[in-house]
Amino acid sequence: YRAAWFGIFQNVLVIAWVMRAMAKIIIVVMGWEDGTTVIGIDAGVFTVLVLFLIAVTYTALSGLWGVVVTDVLQFGLAMGGSIYLAVATWSRLGGLDGILARFPGHDFNAVEVLRMLPAPEKLLAANPFTEFLLLILVVWWASYQVDGGGYISQRLFAAKNERHSVFAYLWFCVAHICLRPWPWIIVGLGGMALFGQVGDPETYYPMMMKEILPPGIFGLVLASFFAAFMSTIDTQLNWGSSLVVNDLLRRFIWKGKSDRSYILAARLSVMGLAVLGALASFALSDISFAWKLILSITAGIGSVYIARWYWWRVNAWSEISAMVTAGICTLVFAIMASTGRFAESPVTRFPYSTVITFLIVVPVWITVTLLTRPVSDERLKDFYRRVRPGGKGWERIRKAAGVEALPGTALRTASKIAAGIVLVFSTLIGTGSLILGEPGRGL
């Protein structure tokens, strides 16, 4: 069930929004109007499909090693391009003061736009401050990405040793969450200052590329976007095909076949996921809708992923019940939002609906866990001997396995988690505060 859910449904949704984003960029860059076609196909979609086929080809041929190697090169190219555009935007508009000077003519509050943290307002009411609190206190860890996700696990397992994997993940958190977004944000602010509310805000970035960059540099930055696009696509396809083949076909449908057969199945699954993602991209007009949907349909699953390290009773039904319940809640909120009575209610809007879903999902999966059969003691004991999870929740299994308790394991793990959260949030907010003219908070 998990393989089908994440490997196919969710994976296809992510691929679709990446394709749609790239299509929007290409349409702006090429100056195409809506309706422009190439060999009878929408011009933006046609170009993305060509790039997509290239990414699919080397993903299918190279496997995880090829994906990781190309990701390193593509990440460097993508970051270099985004940093250059951010610096050029900052210089062209005269820094923060220049951006502020251009805001008064627009229909939004420049102070609120440039505020690193929203101004405190009344709690338990629909406002930006409440939404901010919900995002940082609940949404980010309650969803499926709390453990990093499958493609992060792939890379951690492929590391030389545990020490390498720990430092790799720390670097990923800092680079991916704290540093990578800020060049994009600077360019986005520049786009808001220059273009205001003209056109689709999701196209401001390529509009800034055309406005700011000279021809040669423009080509390099555009190439960096292609690199980021293909890096994301090959990562998603490699992870998705590994779930489909190893967790679905090999275990339940196509058992006992040769390695060669499974390699062929992996390549075919890459092609299948690519086709599904391309088809799904045609249905997307708003990119943010896709990631909000994913956070909503996985709300509460993060609590299962955390609990399984501290409570031996968590089983497969815990995760399945959380997924099903979150999906049902998301569907119910979507139906409510489409009716006149609830159309304007914040209850049906992200992130309020996501948090409500989480509050429903948690008691459901705990109840299902207690009502279903636990994992066999032999498997739990084997897991405990290998991993040595801490806390009182594993005490029964520890005694059954005849293993000495590691003193302070749970406390040490909790302190490391807390330190990691503080590091990431402090670096993220501190960097932004320095950029946005709040040095006191930044330092």
State each model region's role.
Residues Y1-L443:
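Membrane-embedded helix-loop-helix hairpins and adjacent transmembrane boundary segments
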